[in-house]
Amino acid sequence: MDISNQLTLEQEFELVLYKQKIDPLNLEQAQNLLVETLKTMMLKDNIIKYVVKNSHFR
């Protein structure tokens, strides 16, 4: 069974914390948080690509 698209219990908890953080924000604040989160995800993708590209286990 492929579970790579499912969240772990820890990730589910983290998601609840994010929702609690977002609820009191106004639209502009929420949009800024979204942009920063997307930027962080893109940087994470770049790091993963770099590690895979430079891995000796290919």
Swiss-Prot record:
Cellular component GO terms held in the UniProt record: chloroplast
Record's keyword annotation contains Ligase: no
InterPro entries: NblA (IPR007574), NblA_sf (IPR036904)
Subcellular location(s) per record: Plastid, Chloroplast
Top-rank taxon: Eukaryota
Signal sequence bounds: none
Keywords of this entry: Chloroplast, Plastid
Record-stated family: Belongs to the ycf18/nblA family.
Name under which the protein is recorded: Uncharacterized protein ycf18
The organism of origin for this protein: Porphyra purpurea (Red seaweed)
